[in-house]
Every structure is written in C-alpha cells, then in structure tokens.
Amino acid sequence: MNNNDIEYNAPSEIKYIDVVNTYDLEEEASKVVPHGGFNYIAGASGDEWTKRANDRAWKHKLLYPRLAQDVEAPDTSTEILGHKIKAPFIMAPIAAHGLAHTTKEAGTARAVSEFGTIMSISAYSGATFEEISEGLNGGPRWFQIYMAKDDQQNRDILDEAKSDGATAIILTADSTVSGNRDRDVKNKFVYPFGMPIVQRYLRGTAEGMSLNNIYGASKQKISPRDIEEIAGHSGLPVFVKGIQHPEDADMAIKRGASGIWVSNHGARQLYEAPGSFDTLPAIAERVNKRVPIVFDSGVRRGEHVAKALASGADVVALGRPVLFGLALGGWQGAYSVLDYFQKDLTRVMQLTGSQNVEDLKGLDLFDNPYGYEY
C-alpha cells in the first residue's frame, strides 16, 4: 500500500475456520488481505533470516514420548498474576489488527475473551480502548506501551489503560527504532488508519504514516529508570518485553519488573538475532523463578508451547497465527486458532505423559545434536 491508495479493503467475513496447522493459515490469509497489509503482518527484518531462525530453533530441543504415565484428559488450564486462563497462552500485543479485518482489535478481543485467556492491547492499536473493551466484554487485559518522549504523556496513557481495566503493563523495550523491514520498504507501506491511543504524541493520527515515522515520534532513550517509573506510577505489575539476554532480565527484575517477556519481536527488529527459543533456557536460569516469564516469537504448534514451558516459560504469547485467523474469519476465525492450539497442546500432553501444565514445566527435553537438519 502507498499514499496513492484511497481505501484499504480489509476482509470482513465472520466464520469459524478449519485449522489443520497454523503454517497454512499464512498462505490462506495472503489471498484475502491486501498486499501491503499482509506483508506488514507477515514480514520481518532484512531477508527474514531471524524469522526462519525462530522456526528452526524448535528443532534444537525435542520432546520425549512417555509411556504408561497414568494420564487421561489433560488439563491445560493455568494461572498467571492471579488470572485463571483456559490454556498456557495469551494474545501478544500486535499493532494494527485492522490490516487483517474490519473489526480491528475488537474482533481479536472477542475471540480472546470467548476462549478464556488474556488480551494484550498494543499502544499502536487501530481501535480505541472503548472499542476493544466492548469486544472483551469484561475479559482480562494487559496494556503494552510504546513510550512517548514526554513523560507526562506516558503517565496519561498509563492512567487511561488502568481506568480501562488493564491489570499489567508491558513495556516494549526492543523497539526504540524500527527494524529494517524489507517488505515494508519495497511496498512503501503506510498505515491506512489512525492509532487513537498514541495519536497525542504522533505528528498526526498515524494514518498515512510509515513505521519509521511512528517510531521516530516515540522515545528512543529507554533506561532502567523507565521501568521503575512505569511500575511506580501505574501501581501495576510490569513485564519488560524484548528480553533476549540474561543480563537484561536480571537488570529488569532489579529495577522493578514483575515479569520477563522473552521475545525478538517476531524477528521484526534486530536482524541476525538468535532464534528466540534458543535464548529462553539461559534467561530462565538467570530469572530462577523470581518472576513469571512470558515467551513469544515463532510459536506455531502445541509442541512449541510444551517446549517453551519445559524450558522455563510460564505462558507463551501468540501473534501472527491469531491475526491470520482473524483475517480468514473475524473473531470466529481467531477463536478457531486459539481452539486449535489448545487441542494440539492437549494431544502433546497426552503423548508426553503430562496431566497438567506443571507436568509440562517439568518435562526433560532431548538436546538434538543434529540441529535443524535432523
């Protein structure tokens, strides 16, 4: 999409979809989402090596089948920060759901609420707090902040999020500038609609702006003090998102973080960074259960959820697959994806002898000496 486009025609159909696997959803979504919007959602930095590394990293550790473990009807439910959720996954904060469907974040929110897990609301949402809240219908929500340069604007946004019902804040700290996203550059991509939550600090509403313009209006000089100030002002638990190094996890906890979010931003930021799953074990070891860990980047199967939990995560966050489901069927399509993950995880739990989520966290993994080519 470019500035000459008059109208962005996102899909609008609402229907449940059949999900065989989430990889196929990407190709299906490419047929219904406008070219620029699809490539914004699906794309990553550079030639997308790190996106491929996110997928290949799962092959570095394998699951042992376990026999005669006295397991039947595994229980996928768990709890994080006092929220009981149906399965150990939540919705990741993603900008601009309206690229995938006309219902925007409100559609995703309804799917998340109907399923029974937590919605992470992005500051770069194309919908208002009120619209998203209507979709959630009382369901739990966390709020992800991209910081403004003006601290008072940050405080105002945090106050609004808290008034809206947010029970935790996610500080995305890995995006002080945009990654070099080749697809968006080639497409001359600009956002076709506004970002009402952060338009107060943009030079405009975000409509017609590029990602570089938007990141340029946000705070680049994020410091440990910002973690302290967000926690102190909001009075809410703060997750620091974008952690890929154990020392950063340790710093965040010491400066007041109540949770660590292991993520490489879906491979959309630093090019030639490690596959996100490869970084998780060392971070979990350093965290040593002091605070909960959320993991994202590359989760596509029930096996991936199981491996992440066995490697130290408490829950995982789902991103692109849910948006592809939204594109293909609105809230019902997004719900179908969440339902697929639960059913796939239940199957994995049965085959690994895991009656509940705590059993998953205790699984031993096989270190694959052959790597991806095994």
From Swiss-Prot:
Changing Y191F: 4-fold decrease in activity and 6-fold increase in affinity for (L)-lactate. The keyword Metal-binding applies. Changing Y191A: 18-fold decrease in activity and 92-fold decrease in affinity for (L)-lactate. Its EC number is 1.1.3.-. It comes from the Bacteria. Binds 1 FMN per subunit. L-lactate oxidation is competitively inhibited by glycolate, D-lactate, oxalate and 2-hydroxybutanoate. Homotetramer. Belongs to the FMN-dependent alpha-hydroxy acid dehydrogenase family. PANTHER family: 2-HYDROXYACID OXIDASE 1, S -2-HYDROXY-ACID OXIDASE-RELATED. Catalyzes the oxidation of (S)-lactate (L-lactate) to pyruvate, with a reduction of O2 to H2O2. Cannot oxidize D-lactate, glycolate, and D,L-2-hydroxybutanoate. May be involved in the utilization of L-lactate as an energy source for growth. This is L-lactate oxidase.
